Amino acid sequence: MDALAPQHRAAVQDILERLDFTFQIRTPPKQVRLATVEKLYDRPRLSAAMWRFCQFVPRFHTFELSDTAFTVDDLKGLHGTMTLIHKQPGYRIYIADGRVEKGRMNNPIAVGAKMVTAYHYWEGPHGLEGHLQTWTALDSALLGFLSRPFRSYIQRRQEEFIAYIFSNIAQGSEFAESHPQEFAEPIRREGDPVAIRQFEAAFGKNGKH
């Protein structure tokens, strides 16, 4: 907490004081360098384009709002904003402000929430490993009250979804490490100039630095 800017510290404290769910998971070792993962995390528009090429679902699209914030949207009722509030090599903290519309993940009511995500990742003897922790507060006391009958369901679905997302991120990062050139042509075909620029900055014009 001491490393955070005052406004971010206040936002984190607000979430912790209204806490509904906590979650943590370790990601198994993957054959990817920390430097490659940092490149991808620094370029969310590129990461989303690579995610789509890997045919992971949902098909996420991202739009960068600033150097530290971006939106995530699957265009089907799952959307949010991610704000990076602390960064150092191998460690990032985000505040996520998201919403899942009714029925999008078989949820019986629309769910809005704010979440603190702390992700620590490092190169171990068998590859890049990670430890993810999240703290989630539903958007309102009324929503918390209305969701009580479904609380265990909402928590379970959130945990399954986060584990799935980070497993796919790890797999995609591993593929980007070994075959970056495979992404070059599909990203050009999509035609997003930002993603193309970010790919060339990270991996070279044809994925061969």
Task: Go through the PLM ranges and name each one.
Residues 47, 99-103, 137-141:
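Solvent-exposed loop/turn segments at secondary-structure junctions
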Residues 52-53, 108-113:
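"Short basic amphipathic alpha-helical interaction patches in structured regions
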Residues 1-67:
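Hydrophobic ligand-binding cavity/cleft-lining segments
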Residues 22-29, 39, 91-95, 114-118, ...:
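Ordered hydrophobic segments in well-structured contexts
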Residues 79-86, 112-123, 134:
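Hydrophobic/aromatic beta-strand elements that line small-molecule binding cavities or substrate pockets
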Residues 1-5, 120-209:
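Terminal "cap-and-tail" regions of soluble proteins that handle hydrophobic small molecules
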Residues 31, 88, 124-126:
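Solvent-exposed loop and beta-edge segments used for protein-protein assembly and interaction
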Residues 61-110:
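Glycine-rich portal/gate segments that line the openings of hydrophobic small-molecule binding cavities
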